[in-house]
Structure formats: C-alpha cells, structure tokens
C-alpha cells in the first residue's frame, strides 16, 4: 500500500511539474503617469486566460499566467470611466464590452498591441509590439529567461507627437490621444495589404508606415513588416510587458 502511494505521489508531482514547466508568466508594469486598463484577447480555439481585463494604476504591477499553447494579444485602454448609464467606456483602445473585462472583445483601433504565439513544449515563441492597428501608448515586451535572440520588442516613443493630422484621434479637450494606422483610416489595399496587393512584393512600406517605423524601429509598422517587427525566443521564457517604458 505504501509503495503504491509513493508511486502515485511521484507520478502526480511529475505531471504537475510537466504541466507548469512551460507556462509563461506575463508581468505587467505601468510606468505611465496615469491609470491604464489592460485588456486580453485569446485567439480562437486556444485556452482562455484567467482575466480579460483589469485596472493598473501608475507604477503598479500585475501578473498573469498563460496556458500552453497560447496565442493572443494584450493592450492598454486609457481615459476610462463609467458613464451615466453605468457603462464602462474608454477614450482609446476600448473593447466595447461596457465593463472592465473585455469578455472576448478585441481593442477598437487605434491601439498599440503586444502579440504572442507561445507553443507547447518550450519551442520557439513569436512575439511583437504591433502598430498595425495604430498607436495609443508606448509599450515594450521583454523576455525573462529563454534562449536564442530573445530581444526586446518595443515602441517607447510617443507616436502621437509625430502623427499626421489626417491620422490623429483627438480627445474631448482637443489633444491627440491616439494615432490611426493608414489601413484603419483609409481601408485600401495599398495600406492594408489586401487583394490585389496581398504579398510582400506588392505591398511595400508606405510613407505612413515609415512614420511608425522611424519612431519605433522595433515594432511592427504594417502588415508585412515581418523581418523588422517579429521577435523570437526559445526555451519557455516569461515576459515583462511595460506600458510607457
């Protein structure tokens, strides 16, 4: 009986150890001088996270574990409040759920995104900071541990300061609170890399995407910015996401 118990206990510990070996812990830090409300979105058919939205005060931190495999994105909403009807609304990157939790809704552009593809078994992770849906605040993604390149993906600059007038999203006080991407603004194949311009050869960078790239060379600036915007790390690292790095 004792021998059987030892075997069962040993097997249970092995399963627990294996099950958690490659789960990624995502650490969030808000270095912005204002409150943000991060949102999470899991891609279809992937395990869901424990929360889809939360509040993060200036200088506050938060941790979230991802199951594996996992594919999804994070962003931060700004200028949020509860209106007279009790609906939670945000000035930028709102997910239109009416709540702090996004409940499966993505960010309404413009929004700076942190995107992840984390495989099972400690394989090669892919991650990026994307401005394909526009920009609303600076952000960085830094692997913690892991092997290989494991470089920081980031957009530390305030792109709003160099945003062309035709792409600007303004707040109620007239200030620029976010910067639309050309795809979101104009919706044409030239900027969205949709047919008939749906290959890297037929959809090169544009003057608008180069504004994003020049401000944030370590971020995805448009749909086919794979060589400049995609980062990899092996060995099951954890990640630190910093708002206003």
Curated annotation (Swiss-Prot):
InterPro entries for the chain: Osmotin/thaumatin-like_sf, Thaumatin, Thaumatin_CS
Catalytically driven reaction(s): Hydrolysis of (1->3)-beta-D-glucosidic linkages in (1->3)-beta-D-glucans
Keyword Cell division found: no
Cystine bridges: 32-244, 80-90, 95-102, 150-233, 155-216, 163-179, 183-192, 193-203
Top-rank taxon: Eukaryota
Cleavable signal peptide: 1-23
Localization, UniProt: Secreted
Note: Most abundant soluble protein in ripe cherries.
PANTHER family: OS03G0233200 PROTEIN
Name of this protein: Glucan endo-1,3-beta-glucosidase
Originating species: Prunus avium
